[in-house]
Amino acid sequence: MAAPVRRSVVFVTGNAKKLEEVTQILGDSSPYTLVARKIDLPEYQGEPDEISVQKCREAARQIRGPVIVEDTCLCFNALGGLPGPYIKWFLEKLKPEGLYKLLAGFEDKSAYALCTFAFSTGNPEEPVKLFKGQTHGVIVEPRGPRDFGWDPCFQPDGYDQTYAELPKAVKNSISHRYRALSELSAFFLQSNPTEAPSSPS
């Protein structure tokens, strides 16, 4: 019997590390094959959900087909949730060391990482669906490899290593991205029951 045909969905990213991580987490069970595309999208401002929906709608308009957009926030509780959705610019200017120093005057070093995946079928009449995951932790002096954003300064609760120091398999089983992708994957399988593999390959 022929294997089910996997449909493709465009994942908007120019970040090879992010694509690698998302592909690893989704695994072979997804009825969709990810196709990475770098698209120039406007830099929206507002609440995280609003930003995700706007970006996904614009990406779907450009792609004219199914599309996934990811947004990540790093929220410091002492700063009322900042940097939040603006973490990319904070990181570019401050690096992980600067993010750590932002909390130098605060006793509360707690933070949470929030990942939102927005999915559009490509049909502008249909609503954008959001899938969110959150991981709580603390901001620490940077440790570990510097090849993936703010990972060196975020230590998840229950661990004595930063995201950067943790083995990939461990990070991918607890991360904010993993939690959001679990929701997205469940939705894909639920909405494509006939296309999901009946047994592990």
UniProtKB/Swiss-Prot annotation:
Binding of ITP, residues: 13-18, 55, 71-72, 88, 148-151, 171, 176-177
Gene3D superfamilies: 3.90.950.10
Keywords carried by this UniProt record: Cytoplasm, Hydrolase, Magnesium, Manganese, Metal-binding, Nucleotide metabolism, Nucleotide-binding
UniProt xrefs under InterPro entries: ITPase, ITPase-like_fam, RdgB/HAM1
Residues that hold Mg(2+) according to the record: E43
A Pfam family it matches: Ham1p_like
Catalytic activity entry: ITP + H2O = IMP + diphosphate + H(+); dITP + H2O = dIMP + diphosphate + H(+); XTP + H2O = XMP + diphosphate + H(+); N(6)-hydroxy-dATP + H2O = N(6)-hydroxy-dAMP + diphosphate + H(+)
Enzyme class: hydrolase
Protein name listed in UniProt: Inosine triphosphate pyrophosphatase
Family: Belongs to the HAM1 NTPase family.
Compartment annotation: Cytoplasm
Organism of derivation: Gallus gallus (Chicken)
A GO MF label: nucleotide binding
This enzyme's EC code(s): 3.6.1.66
Signal peptide residues on this chain, from the entry's feature table: none
